[in-house]
Amino acid sequence: MTQTIFVLNGPNLNMLGKREPGIYGGKTLKDIEADCKVAGRELGFDIDFRQSNHEGTLVDWFHEADEKAVGVAFNAGAYTHTSVALHDAIRAISIPVVELHISNVHAREEFRHKSMIAPACKGVICGFGPHSYILALHALKNITA
């Protein structure tokens, strides 16, 4: 039976390809989903790829992932810097979570330098463009093997 990885995406990531391509590149979230599914197959994972602009939905998906998946790759978007609820949802589950970002958040505005969720995650990957997602999948393969 193939193991499942949830790839969860937070607010405004549905706008990739349109929103600030100089920062986030030209790939859409659908493009990234397709890349993740290919990489997932190569790594032996089924990829459950989701996006929501709503914090509570993301919390619910973490609870669901704990029952159905072996790990989560998570791009929280702006919730990275504000959400105690997502921090607590990650702490509440038993599977590893890798925080990821397309841009290097540490090379951007000061308010983006602090992650509320990083202390609850197994690790953080940022700054490698859409390839950050693939790196997160490789990290999860390594820590769930």
Swiss-Prot record:
EC number from the UniProt entry: 4.2.1.10
Gene3D superfamilies: Dehydroquinase, class II
Highest taxon of the lineage: Bacteria
A Gene Ontology biological process term: chorismate biosynthetic process
Ranges annotated as spanning the membrane: none
Annotated GO MF terms: 3-dehydroquinate dehydratase activity
Coiled-coil blocks: none
InterPro entries attached to this UniProt entry: DHquinase_II (IPR001874), DHquinase_II_CS (IPR018509), DHquinase_II_sf (IPR036441)
Pfam name, any one: DHquinase_II
Biological or metabolic pathway of the protein: Metabolic intermediate biosynthesis; chorismate biosynthesis; chorismate from D-erythrose 4-phosphate and phosphoenolpyruvate: step 3/7
Active-site residues, Swiss-Prot/TrEMBL: Y24 (proton acceptor), H101 (proton donor)
Keywords: Amino-acid biosynthesis, Aromatic amino acid biosynthesis, Lyase
Site (Transition state stabilizer): R19
Catalyses which reaction(s): 3-dehydroquinate = 3-dehydroshikimate + H2O
Binding-site residues for substrate, renumbered to this chain: N75, H81, D88, I102, S103, R112
Assembly behavior: Homododecamer.
Database matches in NCBIfam families: aroQ, PRK05395.1-2, PRK05395.1-3, PRK05395.1-4
Family membership noted in the UniProt record: Belongs to the type-II 3-dehydroquinase family.
Protein name: 3-dehydroquinate dehydratase
Native source organism of the sequence: Rhizobium etli (strain CIAT 652)
Lineage summary: Bacteria, Pseudomonadati, Pseudomonadota, Alphaproteobacteria, Hyphomicrobiales
Gene expressing this chain: aroQ
